């Protein structure tokens, strides 16, 4: 009944959709698409598919753009060639980085094409900065302590270059990493706002 009620589906950030979630949606959408007045619009970026740990697979979005689609209708793929979100230097870095790993890391032709054909144009917003820090084994007491020390150093350098703490954001893979980094920065008298990690630490 739901497949009859809803005619148009729009799914944003599709790369975050798990296989289980998509398998549950397919019958509903397929039923709706049997009508000529229906449509399915999906937006996503395969390069941002970072949720393998909860069932997400980049191939899922790739298949929808190929002959392996779950549906009987032909897909119409629209590539957004201009990046309006990032500054020029970040876009240049992304183009160079993804092209490099596409050519040198992947052996599958399908995956090579994902990364080597993803060049984006700048929106004209000049500036931006990308830095990559590689830790040497000689810096390690433990991997975690080396990370914490380097993060603290980057923050202090940024403050010396007239940035403020409110300009700085740290992203981590796990909550435990967030708690550990928060504790270390507190010990360095670097003020932080991290309600989630602090709350988890107290629980």
Feature names for model-found ranges:
Residues 1:
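Conserved helicase NTPase catalytic core signature
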Residues 4, 11, 15-203:
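Conserved motor-region signature of P-loop NTPase helicases/translocases
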């Amino acid at each position: 009944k739901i497949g009859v009620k809803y005619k148009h589906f729009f799914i944003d950030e599709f790369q975050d959709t798990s296989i289980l979630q998509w398998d549950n949606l397919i019958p509903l959408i397929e039923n709706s698409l049997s009508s000529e007045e229906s449509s399915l619009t999906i937006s996503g970026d395969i390069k941002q598919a970072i949720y393998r740990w909860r069932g997400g697979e980049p191939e899922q979005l790739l298949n929808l753009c190929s002959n392996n689609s779950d549906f009987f209708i032909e897909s119409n793929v629209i590539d957004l060639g201009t990046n309006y979100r990032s500054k020029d230097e970040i876009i240049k870095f992304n183009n160079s980085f993804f092209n490099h790993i596409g050519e040198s890391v992947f052996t599958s032709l399908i995956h090579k094409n994902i990364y080597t054909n993803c060049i984006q144009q700048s929106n004209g917003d000049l500036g931006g900065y990308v830095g990559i820090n590689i830790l040497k084994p000689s810096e390690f007491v433990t991997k975690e302590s080396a990370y914490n020390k380097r993060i603290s150093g980057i923050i202090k350098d940024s403050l010396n270059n007239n940035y403020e703490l409110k300009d700085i954001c740290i992203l981590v893979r796990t909550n435990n990493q967030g708690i550990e980094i928060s504790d270390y920065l507190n010990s360095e008298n670097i003020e932080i706002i991290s309600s989630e990690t602090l709350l988890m630490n107290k629980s």
